[in-house]
Amino acid sequence: MPESAAAPIHLPKTSESERLKRIRHTTSHILAMAVQKLFPKAQVTIGPWIENGFYYDFDHPEPFSEKDLRLIEKEMVKIIKRKLPVIREEVTREEAERRIRALGEPYKLEILQDLEEPITIYHLGDEWWDLCAGPHVENTGEIDPKAIALESVAGAYWRGDETKAQLQRIYGTAWETPEQLAEYKRRKEEALRRDHRKVGKELGLFIFADPVGPGLPLWTPRGTVLRSTLEDFLKKEQLKRGYLPVVTPHIARVDLFKTSGHWQKYKEDMFPLMAEDAEAAAHEQGFVLKPMNCPFHIQIYKSELRSYRDLPLRLAEFGTVYRYEQSGELGGLTRVRGFTVDDSHLFVTPEQLDAEFLNVVDLILTVFRCLRLNKFKARLSFRDPKSDKYIGSDEAWSKAEAAIQRAVEQLGMEHFLGIGEAAFYGPKLDFIFEDALGREWQLGTVQVDYNLPERFDLEYVAEDNTRRRPVMIHRAPFGSLERLIGILIEEYAGDFPFWLAPEQVRLLPVGDEQRPYAERVAAQLRERGVRVSVDRSGDRLGKQIRNAETQKIPVMGIIGAKEVEHETVSIRTRAAGDVGTFALEHLIAKLTSAMAAIHGDIDWS
């Protein structure tokens, strides 16, 4: 590295840094103290640290403005500079209640009711205190006032319940050094530039419409081409590996999900029951939108008696599922209410489990490589034995977790443990992708399941003619197709690789007299599967080029009188500018070769 080059600034995650956790937690208290000093009518609720900072929720009759945030920020700096001691105090429940009632803080009183003893209070000097379990810094002077910033105000419901009071959530960020804060702001600005909601609108890929509803994207022709290209790619990979396509409906009787356990363990995330009448509703009889595809694939498995010779049976579907996300949790394509999962369920014998699991991991890694998603880590998402959110026996869980552990050890794959991250019916191997801005997203997943085969009484006839229970593998290399596309838009900043671009080539005729030849070239390219258009605007060539580059078309074909005479096309790319003039057949060969290679670039030499 040249001596003048600055080393990249590492931004630690809150979960990785005890010091940063304390800084952010204390800064949230400083925020609350500042708000109550400036706005005495504000009532406090909760204020935790989060991944990139902190927030605090307030009940205040007037909305906080941008001007208010700057005033609050200045007050926070004053508090920090006073170097107030942060003092922990243990009190009885009765004493805590007495103090809270004296302050007139109803939300804190409700929080107190759920707390177990000992009850702890943290003081900022002798002027302000909060119910809190910690941890915190010892003195506000440990926080660098130049390394904090308030960012925004958003609405939030008390305890996440839309039927309860709407609060104002002030978000802030805090770092160890001003340099880290500056780097965080730089990355945030870059994230705004890449935001898939902004870029997707500019490229005309998808829309949201109020009459349709929040969290329900509508895909335009260009966006649908992008979706279809991804689906076709995975379908071909699955075909090579012996997967069989299936299609299942969007709704089913609620009893199906009672058997699977979704109704008992996942009901809050499902859309409400569709009952024919009040009596049916009272007895929880009717239909529901499916939250997952697995119970449907199980019914296909059960439709006939299976032999060990039929296994492994690999059923695959791009199935749309529905989750009732709260409106405040929705976010573009990455958090929606209706989304498509590249779902597959493998029914295998216990002896086939390890090999099939490894084959699924190989498929996921192939997908990541082709999509150029190279920075990821594997998480062993196991159950929390202390939680009651899971179904099945301890023995089934132990066997499933052991199978995943064996696989990652056999592959020599770096991994980390995520206790409590399992699905309610089985453990998972999740692939966590880190994007260009250091943000983490869960994409591919593969799960081992002994529980649903038991709940649905699945069987196969073994070689000794006895009835045995298969094991299920759930897998989704993409995860949610909507989320994947949102991530890809931001990772590529809308500049998709050639094979994936919704519009791969745009032909730019210099004048009207060159347009007939451009149309003939386009027709020949379409016959070979190239996604091509002709600019029919009549604009000058320079404007045509600018428009194509703005719309991130990877290849532009310029056609003037010389190109018509010699039946050639002059090529310009977004990546390299002018790359030369090519005979039509030569150009077609290069483009189709690049499409077949998928993750390779076009060789223009």
UniProtKB/Swiss-Prot annotation:
Q: Which CDD domains match?
A: ThrRS_anticodon, ThrRS_core
Task: Cite the InterPro entries for this sequence.
Answer: aa-tRNA-synt_IIb, aa-tRNA-synth_II, aa-tRNA-synth_II/BPL/LPL, Anticodon-bd, Anticodon-bd_dom_sf, Thr-tRNA-ligase_IIa, Thr/Ala-tRNA-synth_IIc_edit, ThrRS_anticodon
Origin superkingdom:
Bacteria
One GO MF annotation is: threonine-tRNA ligase activity
EC numbers on record: 6.1.1.3
Q: Gene3D superfamilies attached here? A: 3.30.54.20, Anticodon-binding domain (3.40.50.800), Bira Bifunctional Protein, Domain 2 (3.30.930.10), Threonyl-trna Synthetase, Chain A, domain 2 (3.30.980.10)
Its EC top class is ligase
Is Nucleotide-binding found in the keyword set? Answer: yes
Localization annotation:
Cytoplasm
Cofactor dependence is on: Zn(2+)
Recorded family membership: Belongs to the class-II aminoacyl-tRNA synthetase family.
Q: Which named protein is this?
A: Threonine--tRNA ligase
